[in-house]
Every structure is written in structure tokens, then in C-alpha cells.
């Protein structure tokens, strides 16, 4: 399971170093567009499981086709290099409006990559409602 918040920097080639805690879990990865203008980083097998699930839904529904196109067309499969770096393609960097300072967060079965300022704003906004939404999202679990 991916956990935690890790500030990192993009180098001049749009690369960042994977946090040490994630390295053993991410040998082959897929990077794609995420929700709220962040990027999702999946282990390749998890990405295949999710994309299979999406592809097995009713392609007769326009919203399913639209989502599938956006989700898969931006995806980039790769292997981290020997220094554990991941390259962010230009179209993905533009989508998430990533600057030099980025934040890598563990989100359970995947990793999210945020522009650090955007992450701080999102976190500040969402933390205020965190306890209030618990009853709706996870009733009786905690």
C-alpha cells in the first residue's frame, strides 16, 4: 500500500526520483492523467486491472468511451532508471500544471503526483471537511 507525502523536485528533463518507500513496489509503471488535475502513477499490473475493468463496461455509453479515451490516451508506460527516476511526458506535465516543486503522495493502490502549490491548496480546502464527510464516505468504519 502506498502511503505518505513526499516533496520532490523535477529536473531539467522532467524527471523526479521515486521516494525510497515506493521503489520496491514500482518496478514497471504507468503514468496517466488523474482526477483534480494531478497525475496517477500505477504499478503496471494495477493499471492493467483498472483499464480492463473500464474496458469491460458498456462501451455503448458515451461517458464510458470519453473517460476511456482520456485515461488511456495520456498513459505512458516506463521503467524507472537506475537512479529510480520517472520521466513525466510534456503533455502530462502540462495537464497537471507541474512546476519544479512537486508532491508525491501515497493513495493506497496508486501514487499521485501534484504540483506542490496545488496540493497545499487542495489539502487546506479538503481538511476542513475531512471529519464531516467521514460519515458519508465510510459510515461506521472508523
From Swiss-Prot:
Record flagged with keyword RNA-binding: no
A Gene Ontology biological process term: negative regulation of DNA-templated transcription initiation
Top-level taxon of origin: Bacteria
Alphabetic keyword roster: Cytoplasm, DNA-binding, Repeat, Transcription, Transcription regulation
Location of the protein in the cell: Cytoplasm, Nucleoid
Signal peptide segment: none
GO cellular component assignments: cytoplasm; nucleoid
Segments forming domain SpoVT-AbrB: 5-46, 75-118
Pfam families registered for this protein in UniProt: MraZ (PF02381)
Molecular-function annotations in GO: DNA-binding transcription factor activity; transcription cis-regulatory region binding
Family (UniProt): Belongs to the MraZ family.
Assembly information from the UniProt record: Forms oligomers.
Name this polypeptide is given: Transcriptional regulator MraZ
Originating species: Tropheryma whipplei (strain Twist)
Gene: mraZ
